[in-house]
Amino acid sequence: MSAAMAVAQTSIDDYCVIGARGGQWLTPQNTQALHRTAVNWLDAELSRPFAGQTVVVTHFAPHGGCVAPQHTNSDLSPYFVTDLSGLMEKHRIALWCHGHTHTNNDFEAENGCRVISNQRGYPGEVERSGFQPDLVITI
């Protein structure tokens, strides 16, 4: 188990309150495997031809620029953010909306993809999250 996974196992509530198959608790290894499956599925779906711009909406953040300030250089960063900039470039994604980090961002990644989140967060986080209830995104 990597250092980041070990820290997540002991620091993230999900790993002591969410059950997995077989009556076991959810583990970082479970979420890593689920993530790999989801990314493979997303890559395959994005490979299907269609007309128009590509917009992706995910729970987890797709780019290092999404790391919340309190998690910069933290072993917990991989729990909140995974670098999927390769998918952004490969599929020429115009916009990627995400959640999970409880902080908001709006920036253009180096591959031209706009990455945005507008998260309300848990009760009590609205005041400090920067949540914009009237936000409209134009593509």
Task: Annotate each PLM feature.
Residues V55, L95-W96:
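Hydrophobic "anchor" residues on beta-strands that sit immediately upstream
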